[in-house]
Amino acid sequence: MRVDTSELCDIYSDQVDVVEPIFSSFGGLSSFYGKITTVKCFESNGLIAEVLEEEGQGRVLLVDGGGVVRRALIDAELAQLAVDNGWEGIIVNGAVRQLDVLETLDIGIQALAPIPVGADDSMVGEVDTPVNFGGVTFLPEDYVYADLTGIVLSPELLDLQSEDIE
């Protein structure tokens, strides 16, 4: 289903938080939404891989890498794992790599920047913990909506089929 964050902000202005415009789109889908699962980690993606092994239908993985872009937290292998397990999208407060592959995959991916250096695969970090970046606090179980215009956060599922959005 198509997501239009501009229209969501117009309709649900009192219900949503808008993430600062610091992200770019790197995946094959330009818009996506779902219930948030968070991973907080620093230059390692072992926990990310573990979470992406789970069923992802209706879910978006939100990775807080501290805004560090020295190492890519998502690469082609992890993005493909997400696709294989039905994840709707990935948002990374950090870097990604292998853009030529990422842009062909049937998943939305937003991140700060690309870099060719990969992360280590240690299992250091936290899963399903509140994280704060881009001017908002993301709580596990919140809903996130993303498109090429921006990222919007809501504590509850928004009606994307509203006549106002059509």
Swiss-Prot record:
InterPro entries: RraA, RraA/RraA-like, RraA/RraA-like_sf, RraA_gpbac. GO terms for cellular component: cytoplasm. Pfam families: RraA-like (PF03737). Signal peptide: none annotated. One of its GO terms (molecular function) is endoribonuclease inhibitor activity. CDD domains: RraA_family. It comes from the Bacteria. It is found in: Cytoplasm. Keywords: Cytoplasm. GO terms for biological process: regulation of RNA metabolic process. Transmembrane segments: none annotated. Homotrimer. Binds to both RNA-binding sites in the C-terminal region of Rne and to RhlB. Belongs to the RraA family. HAMAP family: RraA. Globally modulates RNA abundance by binding to RNase E (Rne) and regulating its endonucleolytic activity. Can modulate Rne action in a substrate-dependent manner by altering the composition of the degradosome. Modulates RNA-binding and helicase activities of the degradosome. This is Regulator of ribonuclease activity A. The lineage of its organism: Bacteria, Pseudomonadati, Pseudomonadota, Gammaproteobacteria, Pasteurellales. The gene is rraA.
